[in-house]
């Protein structure tokens, strides 16, 4: 099971940097081809919409977000609050990161992120996490190993 940080999805949707885009899309394709279960905190909808709205029209943003939501399992705020609160207290991470890390913890998932600080905090919280930009090969090997 996988939790993808918003950064991975943004890199896949908007190719600001060709290398980040390639890595993100390859990981998404592998997750799809292996039919791996993806969990996301419901806050993803707001965060992803906010980022994409800076670069795309409302209509396109809504379409992107709706398409992603069709393929993931959203975990409600209430289900993650206590875990996210504990993670925030133990790591000092950003609030939104605490929800993604908490989602990985609650669903026993691997966290994938293009945010190095988030990955560091996830590891402090005992979560298996991969920094996509520098641990791409290790992540691909790990995903391939999942039955």
PLM feature spans:
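Short amphipathic alpha-helical segments and helix-helix/interface helices
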Residues: 25-28, 100-101, 119
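Structured helix-beta-strand junction loops
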Residues: 33-35, 71, 107, 125
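Alpha-helix N-cap/helix-start capping motif
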Residues: 7, 42, 78-81, 115-116, ...
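Acidic, PIN/NYN-like endoribonuclease modules and their adjacent C-terminal/linker elements
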Residues: 1, 107-110, 114-147
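Active-site neighborhoods of divalent-metal-dependent phosphate/nucleic-acid chemistry enzymes
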Residues: 73-117, 146
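Short, well-structured N-terminal submotif of metal-dependent ribonuclease cores
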Residues: 1-39, 55-60, 140, 146-147
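Alpha-helical elements of the RecA-like P-loop NTPase motor core of helicases
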Residues: 11, 50, 120
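Active-site-proximal, substrate-binding regions of enzyme catalytic domains
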Residues: 21, 25, 39-86
